[in-house]
Amino acid sequence: MVYGIGGAPEGVAAAAAIRALGGDMQARLIPRNEVKGDTEENRKIASEEVQRCEALGVKVNEILKLEDLVRDDNLVFAATGITHSELLKGISRRGNLATTETLLIRGKSRTIRKIQSIHYLDRKDSEIYEILRN
């Protein structure tokens, strides 16, 4: 069972993983001011959210089924651990090497893969290298 509050992108990502594993889910798009508190800033953001939903033909506060979020099994869900969790190991570093663990789930075949990758940091873009160097 999965239960939580998050933004629309997080909801679609969760729906992709759940569908790929043969599960089911429902969701609702709720304006920010109803979830995060009725402040002036949250009302402004909520107004923009509602406008985006209306432009896409999505009704706010309407229950969305899994099929509304992810139309078919032609998908791949991918997640890489940043910090250690029950599901994935976080990034570990030893000198010039960083190790990551990624979960891949293919929807059509329900194939689940865990991939451990070793990254040579001096071969990465300078921005990534600087972040991981410290």
Feature names for model-found ranges:
Residues 1-4:
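Helix-rich terminal scaffold detector
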Residues 10:
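Glycine-rich phosphate/ribose-binding loops and adjacent secondary-structure elements
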Residues 7, 19-134:
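Anaerobic metallocofactor- and corrinoid-dependent redox/one-carbon enzyme cores
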Residues 13:
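Short glycine/threonine-rich loop/turn motifs
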